[in-house]
Amino acid sequence: MKKTIAIAAVVTAMFHSVNVNAADHTFSVGYAQTDIEGVNKNLTGLALKYRYEPGRLGLLVGLTGTTLNESTTATIVNNQVQINTFDRTYGSIHIGPTYRFNDMVSGYATLGYATYEAKRKSGDSVTSGFEDSNFAAGAGIELNLTQSLALNGGVEYSEHLINSTALTYTVGLGFRF
C-alpha cells in the first residue's frame, strides 16, 4: 500500500511539473483594426503574438498587418472601363517584456517599428503613393482562461507623415504549450 501511494505521488509530481513547464509558451492569432487619423474607414487584418513566460517576467513578440482596399471611381479609357482604387497597408513588428500579476493575468509593453503605405491605382498601374515608417509603442493584457487557452487584447500607437497617428487595436485567442 505504501509503495502504491509513493508511486502515485511521484507520477503526480512528474505530471504536474510537465504541465507547469508546458505552459511557458503562448502563440496567439487574432483580429487587428487600425484607425488612422484622416482616413474615413478602418484598416482590418491579422495580429500574431508569441509569448515566452518562464516565470513572473517574460518576453512577447508581435506582428500586425492591416489593409484597406477602396474602389473610388470608374473611368472609360480607350473604350475600356478602368477602376481607380486606393490601397492602404499598415504593418508592424514589436517586442517587449511581460509581467505575470497572478495565475490568470499578465500584462505587456512593447516597442517596435511600423510602416504605413498608400497607393492610388488606375487599372493595373500605380499612379501615386507614399510610404512612411516610424517607431511604435504598445501595451496589453493576456488572460489565461484555462491551462492551454489564453485571450489577449492590446493597443499599439505610432505616428506617420505630418502628425497623423495610427492606433491599432488587437484581440486574439492563444494556445499555451
Predicted features, each with a name:
Residues 23, 42-46, 87-91, 131-137, ...:
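Residues that define the transmembrane beta-barrel architecture of outer-membrane proteins
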Residues 27-33, 61-67, 97, 109-113, ...:
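Transmembrane beta-barrel strands of outer-membrane/channel proteins
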Residues 25-27, 56-61, 104-107, 143-153:
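Repeated loop/turn-to-beta-strand initiation elements of outer-membrane beta-barrel proteins
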Residues 141-144, 150, 165-177:
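Outer-membrane beta-barrel "beta-signal"
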Residues 1-26:
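Cleavable N-terminal export/targeting peptides
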Residues 52-54, 97-99, 141-143, 157-159, ...:
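Residue-level signature of outer-membrane beta-barrel architecture
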Residues 33-40, 65-89, 115-133, 161-164:
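Flexible, solvent-exposed loop segments that connect beta-strands
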